[in-house]
Amino acid sequence: AYLKGLGLIDLINEAVGTILLEMPEKDVGYGESYLQRCYTLHTALYTQKAYVEIDGNRCCPAESEYCGGYGKIYMFGEGAGAAFMNNYIAGSRDELIGRVAGYFTYGGEMSDEVRVSQYVPAYIVNGSSTAVYKFREANGTDAYSYSGGVAEFYNSRVPLRKVCVATDTEGDAGKWMVNAYREMFMYLQRSANVSTKYLEPTVTNPYQGYVPAPPISRFALSPRNPVINGKTVVGDLQVTFMYDGERFSHIKATGGGFMAEEGAYLDTWYEVVPQEVLNNTAPRHSVPLLLANHGGGDDHLMFLDETGILLTAGREGFAVVAPMHSGITSIAGEAFPLLVKYMLDKYPALDPERVYVTGYSMGGMATYNCIAAHPEIFAAAAPMAMPLFGVPESARALYEKYDLPTMLITSTYDFAAWDTEHGHPNDGGLAVLQTYCEFNGITPVKEFDFTKYPMIGRPFDSFKLSVINGEWRNFEWLIRNDKGVPMVGLNVTEYLQHSLWPGYGDIAYNFLRHYRRRAETGEIIYTE
């Protein structure tokens, strides 16, 4: 009743995530021993395969089991619970506070001795001046705005790092919790990106034996495009889960294994479509389509969320189709082009000249399979975090006829496509550069020279260094053909491990968006 009265039950379901609430009572035992229980809880939240059977129902304390991903965790505290958060959680070891995407307190004092251990978006109502100061300091706020009774202090270089401050004279904590979520927290998420030793496997009951969370010490703060009642908040895209057990059943995987489950076929996908496409008000052939392929073990909707593709699509107004392909990656080259054709036939506003493809890890493999089988239907490709293991001879014959702009997206701790020890793409990553240079009429190099050309190892035509979200250095190289068109690219983000990151959506689309393939001739057209 208490949770329902605050409105948190509805928020939990709306968020498709986790809300941790510290209660206002003083006699619940807040202190160091309670903090240890918080560590155990956080370990469970970030643990895979953590569930118990209760009355025949599977109950999942783990974020990944509940919503298919990580990082939608928000902390709320009132009264004594807020004081516990301020004095124990905020300054805890291992940056416990850095695992949550939003931190709300209603009341609650804070000791002068506490130092907030990492930046965290905070919403403080009836808080002390000490708490406001310390959270502003942790977030590096240097700018200010005021509206509707709420003061917002934010970091002008990284605006996601902010502190909202308000005073409530009506004693309505629930109203402010809902405000904090809807105005701030639901647009934020954490992603597990930097690999060191962080979350050690737990060996204590009741979590003994679960697959441990990845060894992570830093959770990046990133923007998010939440889905509420089947629509994205940014861009008002309709997100629809599709199941069709017949349409593609004639193409079945064979051989067994993770990517080729015997007899499996494409029957499940998500469609993410702008409203003007759904209601037929968009002009014919005016909206691009992105085929987006998830990684191994990923939920296909959370993949769109945690790579930032949902947010990029909302901002840019393109459509997305995301197939579930666990067990059928081996037949992606046959089945997924038919899924693209189905989308183009179903929605006349989608542009057949601007069909793009991307995918992460196993989804990168699906991307290679698609562009090897049917390069003619795609205007550009951006495989992520996956080496190239060769292409069939049939693909070589197709590439004699069709060019295909291709960018490999990876990171410096990506075990799949990057050689961390030597600081450049691994053999499979280099094969992407060599193969798609050759296919696009660019002479491959005889030997890579990483002394002369650090990281990329070969001549290039343009280079860009940027910083994403104020903390992640990003390197991008483009290689042009004899017409001056950039046809091959390499994009590398520093320090990220092999995991989903919300910056990838923008990186991929910023490359893909420049290309279209003429329907009549198959020619690639590039626009700045």
Could you describe each region identified by the protein language model?
Residues 1-47, 148-163, 289, 293-346, ...:
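Active-site machinery of serine-nucleophile hydrolases
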Residues 3-6, 15-18, 26, 32-43, ...:
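A domain-start/cap signature at the N-terminus of enzymes
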Residues 38-71, 335-353:
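Conserved acidic catalytic loop of the alpha/beta-hydrolase fold
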Residues 109-121, 387-404:
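Flexible "cap/lid" loop of the alpha/beta hydrolase fold
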Residues 116-122, 158-161, 400-406, 484-488:
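Short, proline-enriched alpha-helix->beta-strand connector loops that line the catalytic pocket
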Residues 124-126, 408-410:
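Short beta-strand/loop motif that positions the catalytic acidic residue
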Residues 128-130, 413-418, 497-500:
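Acidic catalytic loop of the alpha/beta-hydrolase fold
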Residues 130-143, 424-469:
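Acidic, glycine-rich loop-and-strand cores that form catalytic or ligand-binding grooves
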